[in-house]
Regions:
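Internal, charge-rich low-complexity segments
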Residues: 49, 54-73, 122-156
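Conserved loop/turn motif of beta-propeller repeat scaffolds
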Residues: 1-2, 41, 104, 195, ...
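Conserved strand-to-loop turn within each blade of WD40 beta-propeller repeats
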Residues: 7-10, 47-52, 58, 110-115, ...
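Canonical WD40 repeat/beta-propeller blade segments in eukaryotic WD-repeat proteins
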Residues: 32-38, 95-101, 137-159, 166-171, ...
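Short loop/turn segments that connect beta-strands within beta-propeller blades
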Residues: 18-21, 58-61, 121-124, 212-215, ...
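Short C-terminal beta-strands that terminate individual repeats in beta-propeller domains
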Residues: 7, 23-29, 47, 63-72, ...
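Hydrophobic beta-strand positions that form the internal "hydrophobic ladder"
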Residues: 4-5, 44, 107, 198, ...
């Protein structure tokens, strides 16, 4: 069946052989809980509360584990550095990383420092920083909060960057009187990108669409009353799940909620297939 990657409340990532159900390797290097992982072919990216991302080459796991066992058995050999599965360490966030999205050309992470970062995997450098609190305090970059009910606010088409329109949204109040969000450790609950469009869900209950070419938040979908924990979107719809016990289906063309699904418990994960 292939390979499975898992993370738990520990600082290692486990590699499983689904054909045998065996734990075949550990990805070691993080110094705090691993909060998110994603695999693309032979590469795995992990994000941790130690504020770093690590890129792993899964093809090196077997040789590295074999060398580790040999050293533990006392043959005196050191593990060659070239066999270490960790091929990149990305540092830049000031607090724990709680969400990531990754393909072979693009990596985006979200962290408790309330920023999103895009990374160059070749240089291990951050090439773009998107500040969620700045977007919240400058709503003209996303939605105009002064728009009357009969009016509409400009939005960004996720595929073509064209201006679309949607009705107004109400802005939620911070949980603390001083305006802070510190009660939400996982302030960024989910991120996903498609082309130049990036969607993020955060602790203020807002879903934002960003343009990766400019780093600007062009669109804000507000309606959830608790932190966003998960989301997924395609060319026409975005679906978000929240600790407010609801799943919302958004029309990306109009910005309106098409359907709200009520659940008995806080929603922590979702996936949809538009083909079914």
């Amino acid at each position: 069946y292939g390979t499975l990657i898992s993370a738990a409340l520990e600082d290692t990532v486990r590699v499983w052989d689904l054909s045998t159900g065996e734990d075949v390797g550990r990805l070691r290097g993080h110094t705090d809980t691993v909060k998110c992982v994603q695999v693309e072919d032979e590469l795995c990216v992990s994000g941790s509360l130690d504020s770093t991302l690590r890129v792993w080459d899964l093809r090196r796991v077997d040789a590295f584990e074999t060398a580790c066992r040999a050293r533990m058995e006392g043959d005196g050999q050191d593990v060659p550095e070239a066999d270490d599965p960790c091929i990149r360490t990305l540092a830049g966030h000031s607090r724990g990383i709680t969400a990531l999205a990754f393909d072979h050309e693009t990596l985006v992470s979200g962290a408790a420092d309330k920023t999103l970062r895009q990374w160059d995997l070749e240089t291990s450098q951050c090439v773009l920083t998107m500040d969620i609190l700045w977007a919240m305090s400058n709503p003209s970059t996303s939605v105009d909060l002064r728009v009357p009910p009969e009016s509409s606010a400009p939005l960004l088409d996720p595929l073509h960057g064209a201006n679309q329109f949607a009705g107004p949204f109400s802005y939620p109040q911070p949980p603390y009187e001083d305006g802070s969000w510190e009660m939400y450790t996982d302030f960024v609950g989910s991120v996903q990108f498609w082309g130049f469009a990036l969607a993020s869900g955060s602790g203020d209950g807002g879903v934002r669409l960003w343009d990766l070419r400019t780093g600007q938040a062009h669109r804000t979908l507000l309606g959830h009353t608790a932190p966003i924990t998960c989301l997924q979107f395609d060319d026409t719809h975005l679906i978000s799940g929240s600790l407010d016990k609801t799943i919302r289906v958004w029309d990306l063309r109009s910005g309106h909620v098409l359907e709200t699904l009520h659940y008995d418990y806080p929603v922590t994960a979702l996936q949809f297939d538009s083909r079914k």
